[in-house]
């Protein structure tokens, strides 16, 4: 676990790197997440003060964009498409299978810390649905057997 001094130091370095940038909040949040693997709650008031925003404004942006994490992810991130096109070809069944196989729900990480399961909306692979992203790599035509193979490769 990171201490508040380390968080403050690293966040201030990121803020300084974005000085003078127009509309820096999103790039700052992305940089913090790239550095920490998530955006620590302790970073929000530091960002707010530096950008002359309220904490609510910073939190609002954080919560609006689904890719920002408030907690560290597992070693691997499995994202399953939840858009209508994928749902029409079995994404709900695939999602239920993945949740059961991993023993977790959406936005949770397995007890061993290896896999985080997240919903994502439209990956642009509609013709190859159900679709997924495994550690940033797109995967199409995902079914229960493919989910089992993916999960097996992540553990």
Residue positions per predicted region:
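Signature of N-terminal electron-transfer/Fe-S-associated modules in redox systems
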Residues: 1-155
């Amino acid at each position: 676990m990171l201490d508040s001094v380390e968080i403050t130091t690293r966040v201030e370095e990121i803020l300084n790197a974005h000085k003078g940038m127009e509309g820096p909040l999103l790039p700052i949040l992305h940089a913090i997440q790239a550095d920490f693997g998530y955006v620590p709650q302790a970073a929000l008031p530091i960002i707010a003060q530096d950008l002359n925003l309220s904490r609510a404004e910073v939190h609002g942006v954080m919560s609006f964009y689904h890719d920002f994490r408030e907690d560290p992810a597992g070693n691997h991130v499995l994202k399953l498409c939840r858009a209508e096109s994928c749902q029409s070809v079995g994404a709900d069944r695939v999602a239920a299978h993945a949740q059961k196989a991993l023993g977790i729900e959406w936005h949770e990480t397995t007890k061993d810390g290896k896999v985080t399961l997240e919903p994502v909306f439209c990956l642009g692979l509609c013709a190859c649905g159900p679709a997924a992203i495994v550690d940033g790599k797109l995967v199409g035509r995902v079914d229960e057997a493919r989910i089992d193979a993916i999960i097996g490769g992540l553990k």
